[in-house]
């Protein structure tokens, strides 16, 4: 699997990591900078805390930056 790890960078995931994910959450600067984003690979869709949005997918490069 190939997943984004930053808005313009992607990588080949480790063996067994077949899920791409994109986490989004607000911090103190959310109103001016927007949500913080975390991209990556995982074996399963990560569990998140309340207030954190996550989307998981299982095709190459399926976790792009939402505004690009």
Swiss-Prot record:
Question: Which pairs of positions does the record mark as disulfide bonds?
Answer: 3-20, 13-41, 26-30, 45-56, 57-62
Cellular compartments per GO CC: extracellular region
Pfam families on file: Toxin_cobra-type (PF21947)
Subcellular localization, per the record?
Secreted
What PROSITE patterns would the database entry show? Answer: SNAKE_TOXIN (PS00272)
Q: Which UniProt keywords apply?
A: Acetylcholine receptor inhibiting toxin, Disulfide bond, Ion channel impairing toxin, Neurotoxin, Postsynaptic neurotoxin, Secreted, Toxin
The reply to whether Secreted figures as a keyword in the UniProt entry is: yes
Q: Could you give a GO molecular-function term held by this entry?
A: acetylcholine receptor inhibitor activity
InterPro entries from the xrefs?
A: Snake_3FTx, Snake_toxin-like_sf, Snake_toxin_con_site, Toxin_cobra-type
Q: What is its main location?
A: secreted
The job of this chain, per UniProt, is described as: Binds with high affinity to muscular (alpha-1/CHRNA1) and neuronal (alpha-7/CHRNA7) nicotinic acetylcholine receptor (nAChR) and inhibits acetylcholine from binding to the receptor, thereby impairing neuromuscular and neuronal transmission.
Family to which the UniProt record says this protein belongs: Belongs to the three-finger toxin family. Long-chain subfamily. Type II alpha-neurotoxin sub-subfamily.
Q: What is this protein called?
A: Long neurotoxin 1
- Organism per entry: Aspidelaps scutatus (Shield-nose snake)
């Amino acid at each position: 699997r190939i997943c984004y790890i930053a808005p313009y960078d992607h990588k080949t995931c480790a063996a067994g990591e077949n899920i791409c994910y994109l986490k989004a959450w607000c911090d103190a600067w959310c109103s001016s900078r927007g949500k913080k984003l975390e991209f990556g690979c995982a074996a399963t869709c990560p569990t998140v805390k309340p207030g954190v949005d996550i989307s998981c997918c299982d095709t190459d490069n399926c976790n792009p930056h939402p505004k690009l």
